[in-house]
UniProtKB/Swiss-Prot annotation:
Keyword Ligase: no
Annotated source species: Brucella suis biovar 1 (strain 1330)
Chain intervals for the UniProt region annotation (Disordered): 500-533
The protein, known as: Cell-division control histidine kinase PdhS
Coiled-coil region(s): none
Ranges where the record places region Interaction with DivK: 614-1035
Record-listed E.C. numbers: 2.7.13.3
Source taxon at top rank: Bacteria
NCBIfam families for the chain: histid_kinase_PdhS (NF041593), sensory_box (TIGR00229)
GO BP, one annotated term: cell division
Gene behind the chain: pdhS
Length: 1035
């Protein structure tokens, strides 16, 4: 099971484990609501997937409505689950599903969303459905170690009951409810983990990673005997009348043998993974090594590397032990590993890198190795036999000429079979079998003769002939076949090989046939192919006479080159090629102009190059394995015709070069950093500004990944931005840039704004990075200033609230006593002047109280602390109540109030108390500043664009633009131009608090409406309040 987080780590989270045990469908999403971080089997089934692996780390395409519902919850900072009803599926099969969405924290602290729902099937089998494969095994275990449910191949692990009980005890003692360690399965140990899901009743989730031991037994039997093996053995072994020792040996061979490990010499190279701790002790090794060298030979977990090296005999100079102490990355270390049950050892190449914790604590090494069974060689100490439990023989079996010939023949057949396996189709002509067991009349069965049909050279001729026929058959295919030049060359090679083979056949026909004098006893271990015979001189002679250049090499080591290769390259000998650099100096994968060719490029001794076609085969070479590379020069007819280019214009070339230099200078002059990126996400180059911005030299950053320029928290965002532009999605069209955090070479951080664009010809990208440190500083200063202003406003509001409370108490007493004295309830005052003084005291007290109330209201509005209850308000009714309250005052001032309300006016969404206060303030100002005989007109209307408008027009004295601006400021009164008042009118300008219009405007804006005033001196004033369509409850 893949994924960024181990499956069991998320399954053991407190918010996940109980639902997992119940069999709920669970899904963990990233906050983009597309990336699936984790899912269980029922969750995968809920969204139409059969396997968990099909959905983890994938993209989930949720419906737009579903995403909107989940996104609305994700913005809430709460961990409590929220019920969301969504429709899953599509078309006619869409079903309403109730999901529970909650915010969770992943093991590394990253925030994510858990989406869960109950499923009708809550069985244990349903809880682990969709989990487990050939290498991953899942089981649910109860409190006593009983397996409640398991994946299909879990039983093959053969885990004992005592092991399960120990795991349950360890999981109960673990603070994080998880135990991870190697678990014994049969005769092997594999990595695994167990998590305690529930306590009452106790239920545990067990995860095992690794193949079942039965598969190793199957691999040990994977090399079957030929069909005629029994007949051959009966023909070779002695009869009943032979020596007693031979008879006893036959009886032993007839007994059934236990299944043991069998070494497969022809197996391909295998790759395995290994880990060691800080002290050099092996903590983990993958089963791939055991499949090649045997389970006993690979059973090194828990042993120190130095001890294993001493026992297995590959501890030579101590270089690997020294590298383990240096705690640095290393590779290319080669050692010889003994093979269980054989006298062989196989080469193993090791590489490793150090592992550190988040606290930079050294945890050991993690590495990989490559074991090459085809390059096995004889082990003089025969350690492999001791690993299998056998005792090495004191005497070595004597090889007869026929046995030696048989081994050589097998090598040739192996080389031919590998060449056939590398082709796409079977060969048309198959070679004859190399061995022929022919009974001879008149002889005893013990004297049967095993004769060779061909020598080593004849087998090579047959192999090359079969290969030539196969290549001839493939030449008819439309793609990948040989060219006409290659077919002619191979016909010439085949003719020469045929003639050489006939000459060798005639020479060998005169050689007497060797016979075997005795048959060696059958070893208890499986037979192993030996490759100790050197190659025949005839084979080298054949290669030397070939007109085709041939190279025989193993990796970077060249073993042989023929004269044709020396002639074409211009080197004098093989030693000259080795001293010049070996294989690397002969070939160039790219041409001078940087364009990669389909064919290889052969480099001559003088530095010139020539395109060639190459054919690679695996062959047997001097007791080992090697690669034969045959080359064929590409003729002019095979090369594509170059396009005819116009004659180069030196002036245009110079102008183009000058233009390129100008562009480079412009990029270096730009203050923004510019970075060029290749399609693989590596840095190609950067300008001077980018180099100075990050503190890297140009050559130091080239070739490294683009993500190195960013802080850890911004690396994923930057790479997602880059990958999004690589496709043809929305990002490639709507490219609005990203804010990221850059990382300097010395470890500092820089806020950046990054914009990336695609380069048309190279398929790369261009990133423009701008330092926004000053912007961020200004933004921070503005934020701090806003917080300071809000704090000052809150202090002002708190101050006014306290002052209001302190002033109200004495004011209420003054107003109340003045009214009581003016009413003369306790006796006459006796003087009218005292009565006037009492009325002045009462009026002044009410004026101060109104001023305090207005101050408190406007401060609350500015601080956003005014309690407003928005509801449906009938604007006509609210204005009508205000007119009714102002009508007595208008009558005393001899001012006519007229109203014009539109019928069927829709209600508005507003605060009813503040709307009435606004209407009262506007009517009060209009009546107070209108001379007797004037008019005040109040109207409402419903505009075509959906606005509801309220207008208050008067015929008063009016104001100029400067006076309007002054009137809209708090505590400002208009005290100029007093001569405009009528003779019988009193001084309206000296009354009021200067808060009428500012408070009215603040209340209007608090109700999400617009306030406008238009006034002209001597013509009156019009105040207009507009409620937008969003605040209108239209039918």
């Amino acid at each position: 099971m893949s994924g960024s987080y181990p499956f069991i780590d998320i399954a053991a989270l407190d918010s996940v484990r109980e639902g997992f045990a119940r069999g709920d469908a669970q899904l963990v999403l990233a906050h983009d609501l597309s990336t699936v971080l984790w899912v269980n089997g029922p969750g995968a089934k809920l969204f139409g997937y059969n396997r968990v692996e099909d959905l983890i780390e994938g993209q989930l395409d949720l419906p737009v409505a579903t995403r909107r519902q989940i996104a609305a919850f994700s913005s809430e900072n709460t961990s409590a689950p929220s019920a969301v009803a969504v429709r899953l599926g599509g078309g006619l099969r869409s079903e309403l599903t109730h999901l529970h969405v909650s915010n969770i924290k992943l093991p590394d602290g990253v925030a994510a969303l858990l989406v869960a729902t109950q499923m009708p099937d809550n069985s244990a089998e349903a809880a682990i459905s969709g989990l487990g494969d050939d290498s991953t095994h899942i089981a649910l275990v109860d409190a006593v170690g009983k397996v409640v449910a398991a994946s299909p191949r879990f039983a093959l692990l053969d885990i004992s009951a005592s092991t399960l009980e120990d795991l349950i005890v360890e999981a109960g003692d673990a603070t994080d409810r998880i135990v991870k360690r190697r678990i014994r399965t049969g005769s092997h140990s594999v990595p695994g983990a167990i998590a305690r899901l529930t306590d009452t009743p106790a239920l545990h989730l067990l995860c095992i990673v690794g193949d079942a031991p039965a598969q190793f037994q199957t691999a040990a039997e994977a090399v079957p005997l030929p069909d005629n093996a029994e007949a051959v053995l009966e023909e070779i072994l002695p009869e009943q009348g032979d020596a007693p020792a031979q008879q006893a040996q036959k009886t032993h061979a007839e007994q059934p043998r236990p299944k043991t490990f069998a070494f497969d010499h022809d197996a391909p190279p295998a790759r395995f993974i290994w880990k060691v701790g800080p002290d050099g002790t092996f903590s983990e090794i993958s089963p791939d090594l055991a499949a090649v060298v045997g389970p006993n030979s690979a059973d090194i977990v828990g042993r120190r590397f130095s001890d294993v090296a001493n026992v297995f005999g590959f501890y030579t100079d101590g270089s690997i032990a020294a590298l383990l102490l240096e705690r640095d990355t290393w590779s290319g270390k080669r050692l010889l590993w003994p093979v269980e049950g054989t006298r062989l050892r196989v080469p193993v190449e090791l590489a490793a890198l150090p592992v550190y914790s988040r606290d930079r604590e050294f945890l050991g090494f993690r590495g990989f190795g490559i074991v090459r069974p085809a390059e096995a060689e004889a082990d003089p100490e025969e350690i492999g036999l001791a690993l299998a439990g056998g005792i090495p023989q004191n005497r070595k079996p004597r090889k007869e000429p026929a046995e030696t010939a048989r081994m050589v023949g097998e090598d040739d057949v192996l080389a031919l079979s590998e060449e056939v396996a590398n082709d796409d189709q079977p060969a048309a002509v198959l070679p004859k079998p190399p061995l022929d067991i022919t009974p001879t009349p008149g002889r005893r069965d013990s004297d049967k003769v095993i004769s060779l049909l061909n020598s080593c050279a004849q087998e090579k001729v047959a192999a090359d002939q079969a290969k030539f026929l196969k290549e001839k058959e493939r030449a008819t295919r439309p793609e990948g076949g040989l060219t006409k030049t290659e077919r002619n060359a191979f016909r010439e090679i085949a003719e020469r090989l045929r003639k050489q083979g006939l000459a060798n056949t005639r020479a060998e026909s005169e050689t007497p046939v060797s016979e075997t004098s005795s048959i060696e006893p059958v070893e208890p271990t499986p037979p192993v192919k030996t490759r100790s015979e050197p190659i025949q001189p005839d084979e080298t002679a054949l290669l030397a006479n070939l007109p085709v250049p041939v190279i025989i090499h193993s990796g970077d080591a060249i073993h042989y080159v023929n004269q044709a290769l020396l002639d074409i390259t211009g080197y004098e000998s093989l030693d000259d090629i080795r001293s010049a650099g070996g294989v690397d100096v002969l070939f160039n994968s790219e041409s001078d102009d940087g364009e990669t060719r389909q064919s290889m490029v052969l480099r001559h001794a003088d530095g010139s190059e020539e395109p060639v076609d190459a054919h690679l085969n695996a062959i047997a070479w001097r007791g080992g394995r090697a690669l034969m590379l045959s080359l064929m020069p590409v003729t002019a007819a095979d090369l594509p015709a170059p396009a005819e280019l116009p004659a180069a214009n030196d002036e245009e070339k110079q102008a183009l070069e000058a233009h390129v230099e100008e562009l480079k200078t412009i990029l270096d002059t730009a203050t923004d950093g510019v970075v060029l990126i290749d399609p693989e996400g590596r840095i190609r180059s950067m300008n001077h500004s980018a180099s100075a911005l990050f503190g890297y030299e140009r050559d130091e950053a080239e070739g490294k990944f683009f993500s190195m320029l960013f802080a850890i928290e911004s690396q994923r965002a930057a790479m997602d931005y880059l990958h999004g532009l690589s496709g043809n999605g929305v990002l490639s069209v709507l490219n609005d840039g990203r804010e990221v955090i850059g990382r300097e070479a010395k470890g500092g951080f820089i806020p950046l704004f990054m914009t990336i664009g695609k380069l048309p010809h190279t398929r790369g990208f261009c990133a423009v990075l701008r330092d926004i440190t000053q912007w961020k500083r200004t933004e921070e200063e503005l934020t701090n200033a806003r917080k300071e202003a809000e704090r000052a406003s809150n202090q002002k509001t708190e101050f006014l609230a306290r002052i209001s409370h302190e002033i109200r108490t004495p004011l209420n007493a003054i107003i109340g006593f003045s009214e009581l004295m003016a009413d003369e309830k306790f006796g006459p005052i006796g003087n009218d002047r005292y009565r006037d003084y009492l009325r002045d005291i009462n009026r002044s007290g009410n004026h101060v109280l109104a001023l305090v109330n207005d101050l408190l209201d406007i401060s609350k509005i500015e601080a956003g602390a005014l309690d407003m209850q928005f509801e449906a308000v009938s604007l006509n009714d609210a204005i009508g109540e205000a007119i009714a309250l102002m009508q007595p005052q208008a009558n005393r001032e001899r001012v006519i109030i007229r109203s014009s309300f539109q019928s069927n006016l829709p209600d508005i969404v507003a605060d009813s108390r503040s709307i009435k206060q606004v209407a009262l303030n506007l009517l009060s100002n209009a009546v107070r500043f209108t001379a007797p005989g004037g008019q005040v007109i109040v109207s409402t209307s419903y505009e075509l664009n959906g606005d509801v408008v309220m207008r208050v027009r008067d015929t008063g004295i009016g104001m100029s633009k400067s006076e309007v601006e002054q009137a809209l400021k708090p505590f400002r009164q208009i005290n100029a131009l007093e001569g405009r008042k009528a003779e019988s009118a009193k001084d309206w300008r000296n009354e009021g608090t200067g808060l009428g219009l500012p408070l009215t405007k603040a209340m209007v804006e608090a109700n999400r409406a617009q306030f406008a005033i238009d006034s002209n001196p001597g013509q009156g004033t019009v105040v207009e309040i507009v409620f937008p369509p969003t605040r209108v409850l239209a039918d």
